Amino acid sequence: MPLPDLSTLSADQPVLIAGPTASGKSALALRIAERQGGVIVNADALQVHHAWRVLTARPSPQDEARAPHRLYGHVARGTPHSVGHWLREVTPLLSGQRPIIVGGTGLFFTALTQGLSEIPEVPAEVRARADALREGDFARMQADLGARDPETSARIDMANPMRVQRAWEVLETTGRPLARWQADTPPPLLPRSRAARFVLEAPKDWLAPRIARRFRQMLDQGALDEARAALPHWDAAAPWARAIGAPELIAHLRGEITLDAAEEAATRATRQYAKRQRTWFRARMRDWTPVPPGSA
């Protein structure tokens, strides 16, 4: 398949590239940067973590030498990082050399191009209570939110535990409905109309063997060594521990499963993650330019 037509892009037009894991996003970003110039900026919540270069498929040192890269591997283990942190980090990069923003975290792109509500962070104590209530009595959480915040309840999928918990946490933390916070969303940093927007298509039958092949390559390139270095600090609930494949490799290092079983489980988890990404992109990026499989 051909590369997307670059002749329609001006050299200073921001570029956004989204797509599921293992679909070739980074390769496409690098080709555009080498042909037209620009700074490649990470928009993947997993690739910000310093602990995982191989396991999150961050660009290699060789690729980083071919074009400037920003916001990769800059977050230390245990350091909080959210979409709000990312927006603050990306802001100065929008006014310098043309940014080529690439990643698989749909929320980053939505916040960048549509704005982000300035909702205070949920305290750990509230999050713990919310987790316990959702897991122990989700019906009670639904009823409580419905009674105290009918405005938000009418707008969200009340059968979705994560959506309900988020709205409940915001109400508990701020005393204000999530719907009202969202209504006060500030203007976006980069309106969609200003950027060239590409989303990589990755049908599951095409992507599945790529995922399996890539995880095998990760093992060959040192993913197990990364997990071994992380083992003394392991906290399964920590954001940095959410790297796909990390829990499985840690389980192997602890003697709980074989390496073959870890590889199979990690590959399966990656396929499931890619499915969630495809669902997000189909729902929210219908006006983005599709890039056929293999174009990158």
Curated annotation (Swiss-Prot):
Substrate binds at residues 21-26. Keywords: ATP-binding, Magnesium, Nucleotide-binding, Transferase, tRNA processing. ATP binds at residues 19-26. Belongs to the IPP transferase family. Catalyzes the transfer of a dimethylallyl group onto the adenine at position 37 in tRNAs that read codons beginning with uridine, leading to the formation of N6-(dimethylallyl)adenosine (i(6)A). This is tRNA dimethylallyltransferase. The record marks 105, 127 as: Interaction with substrate tRNA. Signal peptide: none annotated. One of its GO terms (molecular function) is ATP binding. Monomer. It comes from Dinoroseobacter shibae (strain DSM 16493 / NCIMB 14021 / DFL 12). It catalyses: adenosine(37) in tRNA + dimethylallyl diphosphate = N(6)-dimethylallyladenosine(37) in tRNA + diphosphate. Its cofactor is Mg(2+).
